[in-house]
UniProtKB/Swiss-Prot annotation:
Residues involved in DNA binding: 91, 110, 151
Cofactor note: Binds 1 zinc ion per subunit.
Zinc finger (FPG-type): 236-270
InterPro entries per UniProt: DNA_glyclase/AP_lyase_DNA-bd (IPR015886), DNA_glyclase_Znf_dom_DNA_BS (IPR015887), Formamido-pyr_DNA_Glyclase (IPR020629), FPG_cat (IPR012319), MutM-like_N-ter (IPR035937), Ribosomal_uS13-like_H2TH (IPR010979), Znf_DNA_glyclase/AP_lyase (IPR000214), Znf_FPG/IleRS (IPR010663)
Keyword RNA-binding: no
Origin species: Actinobacillus pleuropneumoniae serotype 7 (strain AP76)
An individual GO BP term: base-excision repair
Summary of subunit composition and partner proteins: Monomer.
Protein name: Formamidopyrimidine-DNA glycosylase
Gene responsible for this protein: mutM
PANTHER family referenced in this protein's UniProt entry, alphabetically: FORMAMIDOPYRIMIDINE-DNA GLYCOSYLASE (PTHR22993:SF9)
Catalysed reaction equations from the record: Hydrolysis of DNA containing ring-opened 7-methylguanine residues, releasing 2,6-diamino-4-hydroxy-5-(N-methyl)formamidopyrimidine; 2'-deoxyribonucleotide-(2'-deoxyribose 5'-phosphate)-2'-deoxyribonucleotide-DNA = a 3'-end 2'-deoxyribonucleotide-(2,3-dehydro-2,3-deoxyribose 5'-phosphate)-DNA + a 5'-end 5'-phospho-2'-deoxyribonucleoside-DNA + H(+)
Domain of life: Bacteria
Similarity section: Belongs to the FPG family.
């Protein structure tokens, strides 16, 4: 699943081709994604793309005729190509075509993403309920400690909750907890202030590093330039069940926590009894 670094990578990849451009047409081949594609998108001819931004895992195109919210879902990706360069494939559901012949193509085999129109993205219900950005100054140890009080949920589920902090998906949650030395099943309310300081620090480090390296190379993620990301080459625990921990040599274990596979080192991440 594309996570925050993948969406940030997509934003940086497509922005040079779309910023300041005039929309010629938006071609919708599949109306039903996670939510129905907004009808308004097919009436945006002449709209100028004045800015592009990201909030959590939503890519936002700000235009003179409202904002377009794009979510990549479980397997979505964005590509840039020239108009008529390549016929649309089976899973190419939406094309945004600019007047100068550039195409933003949305591919999604599982059809679990979205393309929505809204007058103002900041006021859309999908955006207003989100927690702080993990790389922002709002995401601090003091904030995380305060939000964790009386929370009996496992710390892994806690940091993956978008109401608490956005964009810490399964891969990066596993990696961050390993680097912080915290067992994924530790109750959030048992976090100490010092542990929160460490956890916030490594979450920021892991995500920043992944963005620099282009996101995580998984079968469903391709960068807008067609190249894979490279962060998977340095994953410490995620997807490494049965392999030796790079720090201590103990065998990495996996367990389903909150309906997600969670990877951890039982020696480096001890669950207090």
């Amino acid at each position: 699943m594309p996570e925050l670094p993948e969406v940030e990578t997509s934003l940086r990849g497509v922005e040079p081709y779309l910023h300041g451009k005039i929309i010629k047409q938006i071609v919708v081949r599949t109306q039903k994604l996670r939510w129905a594609v907004s009808d308004e998108l097919q009436h945006m001819q002449g709209a100028k793309i004045v800015a592009l931004s990201r909030r959590a895992k939503y890519l936002i195109l700000h235009t003179t005729q409202g904002d377009i919210l794009i979510h990549l879902g479980m397997s979505g990706s964005l590509g840039i190509l020239q108009e008529n360069q390549q016929p649309a494939g089976k899973h190419d559901h939406v094309d945004l075509i600019t007047q100068d012949g550039m195409v933003l193509r949305y591919n999604d085999p599982r059809k679990f993403g979205c393309w929505l129109w809204t007058k103002n993205a900041e006021q859309h219900e999908l955006i207003t309920r989100l927690g702080p950005e993990p790389l922002s100054e709002s995401f601090t140890a003091a904030y995380l400690f305060a939000r964790s009080r009386n929370k009996t949920v496992a710390v892994k589920n806690f940091i993956m909750n978008n109401d608490i902090v956005v964009g810490v998906g399964n891969i990066y949650a596993c990696e961050s907890l390993f680097m912080a030395g915290l067992h994924p099943e530790l109750a959030a309310q048992n976090l100490t202030e010092k542990q929160c300081e460490r956890l916030v620090k490594v979450i920021k480090e892991v995500l920043a590093k992944a963005i620099i390296q282009g996101g995580t190379t998984l079968k469903d993620f391709i960068q807008p330039d067609g190249k894979p990301g490279y962060f998977a080459q340095v994953l410490q625990v995620y997807g490494r069940k049965g392999e030796a921990c790079n720090d201590c040599g103990t065998i990495i274990e996996a367990k389903v926590i909150g309906q997600r596979n969670s990877y951890f080192c039982p020696h480096c991440q001890i669950l207090p009894r």
